[in-house]
């Protein structure tokens, strides 16, 4: 019994000593935080000097190297390990836009990472996206050099360019074509019978129904309404598909515009 008590007494002393040392370290950290706080300086470097740090960008690599250098400076041993490989990289350049004309304005917008930029300043007319095959056929000749307003409310992701996205768009186009056919019959009946029956609504909740066709027609880019504050995420297909190369990257801009400015332009 006496031996047992001595062991427990020894363990209790060790625990007290350990807790005391831990408390001293915690108190020192709190003191430094109160008297020599560097949080805002570090945040300034990361957000203003380095900026956005999407994976696959030079800014991400710069941020990793800077953080590693700070840890080394504080006496820590640092080892950088590769977490994975991306098929292509992405560096964001400057962006700006302006609506020209009588009610001109500076445009407030973002573009998702890993989407296409422009080759310098691109000026063009604005069109509303087509919802049926007949609408596309009528406006096809006007699409070259146009900025196209597309439907839907964006939350940061780019237009879905995947095969699944193509399939969804094709199904809605087919449905809209049938609705347009019914609407033509309704209009004929209204004219013939002097009635005023309402037309059936077309589906427009999925953006850029004729995405590939409009790209092939030579549009400058797509503009979609986005809620404020604006969010710019990334093209998931490029990030997760190792078969992507510089030869099959997106080539048309995908702009997410302040919803209020979008509404003003659409009017």
Q: How does the language model describe each region?
A:
Residues 23-57, 83, 234-238, 242:
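N-terminal capping segment at the start of a domain
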Residues 163-177, 216, 223-256:
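Surface-exposed loop and adjacent secondary-structure segments within mature catalytic domains
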Residues 23-27, 40-43, 47, 61-68, ...:
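Extracytoplasmic/secreted envelope proteins and their assembly/folding machinery
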Residues 35, 44, 48, 52-186:
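Noncatalytic luminal/extracellular "stalk/propeptide" segments of secretory-pathway proteins
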């Amino acid at each position: 019994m006496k031996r047992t008590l001595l062991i427990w007494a020894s363990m209790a002393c060790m625990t007290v000593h350990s807790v005391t040392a831990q408390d001293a370290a915690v108190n020192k950290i709190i003191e430094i935080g109160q008297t020599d706080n560097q949080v805002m300086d570090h945040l300034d470097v990361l957000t203003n000097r380095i900026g956005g740090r999407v994976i696959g960008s030079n800014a991400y690599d710069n941020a990793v190297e800077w953080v590693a250098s700070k840890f080394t400076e504080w006496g820590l041993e640092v080892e950088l390990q590769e977490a994975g490989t991306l098929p292509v990289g992405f560096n964001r350049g400057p962006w700006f836009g302006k609506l020209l004309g009588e009610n001109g304005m500076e445009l407030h917008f973002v573009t998702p990472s890993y989407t296409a930029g422009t080759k310098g300043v691109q000026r063009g007319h604005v069109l509303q996206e087509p919802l049926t095959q007949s609408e596309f056929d009528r406006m096809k000749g006007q699409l070259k050099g146009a900025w196209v307003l597309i439907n839907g409310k964006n939350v940061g992701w780019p237009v879905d360019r995947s095969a699944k996205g193509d399939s969804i768009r094709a199904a809605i186009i087919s449905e809209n074509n049938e609705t347009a056919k019914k609407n033509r019959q309704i209009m004929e009946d209204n004219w013939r019978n002097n009635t005023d029956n309402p037309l059936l609504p077309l589906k427009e909740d999925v953006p850029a129904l004729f995405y590939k066709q409009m790209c092939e027609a030579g549009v400058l880019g797509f503009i979609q309404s986005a809620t404020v504050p604006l969010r710019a995420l990334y093209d998931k297909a490029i990030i997760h598909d190792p078969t992507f190369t510089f030869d099959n990257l997106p080539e048309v801009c995908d702009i997410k515009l302040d919803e209020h400015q979008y509404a003003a332009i659409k009017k």
